[in-house]
Swiss-Prot record:
Source organism per UniProt: Photorhabdus laumondii subsp. laumondii (strain DSM 15139 / CIP 105565 / TT01) (Photorhabdus luminescens subsp. laumondii)
Gene: yebF
Organism classification: Bacteria, Pseudomonadati, Pseudomonadota, Gammaproteobacteria, Enterobacterales
Alphabetized Gene3D superfamilies for the sequence: YebF/Colicin-M immunity protein
One GO cellular component term: extracellular region
The YebF/Cmi domain, residue ranges: 36-123
Stated name of the protein: Protein YebF
S-S bridge residues: C40-C113
Keywords assigned by UniProt, alphabetized: Disulfide bond, Secreted, Signal
């Protein structure tokens, strides 16, 4: 009887741990907003700003349902000022502002020109 009780407790603990880990992993993957980006070679800051804006409007907002919901639209107004881009030729940090019908959102975009990746994080 005691053995059966111990096995049940261990089993329930294992299930609880598994659920916790699965929720954590799904939250991390949802917040991890990294994807491939075009090569930065021979692009000016203005061209990179235009590519970031295009990437957000064509690729990101269509897949980020929570952001669309918060903004109140699937067609927000997006702007990037090339003069606000910081960093060197390898890593560029780009402030991105998005305006919807419900609210505005600001993102920090990092373009890794060596890895050809783009990552988004929301500024709160």
């Amino acid at each position: 009887m005691k053995t059966c009780h111990i096995i049940n407790r261990v089993g329930l603990s294992g299930v609880a741990l598994l659920l916790t880990v699965s929720f954590t992993v799904s939250a991390v993957s949802e917040n991890k907003r990294v994807d491939k980006f075009i090569s930065c070679d021979n692009l000016t800051k203005s061209q990179i700003a235009a590519q970031v804006k295009r990437d957000f409007l064509q690729n990101r907002i269509n897949h980020w349902s929570e952001d669309r919901k918060q903004l109140g639209t699937s067609k927000p107004v997006v702007w990037v000022k090339a003069e606000n881009i910081t960093g060197d030729k390898e890593i560029l940090k780009i402030p991105l502002t998005v305006r919807g019908s419900k609210r505005d959102k600001d993102y920090r975009v990092v373009v890794d020109c060596q890895q050809n990746t783009i990552s988004y994080s929301e500024l709160k």
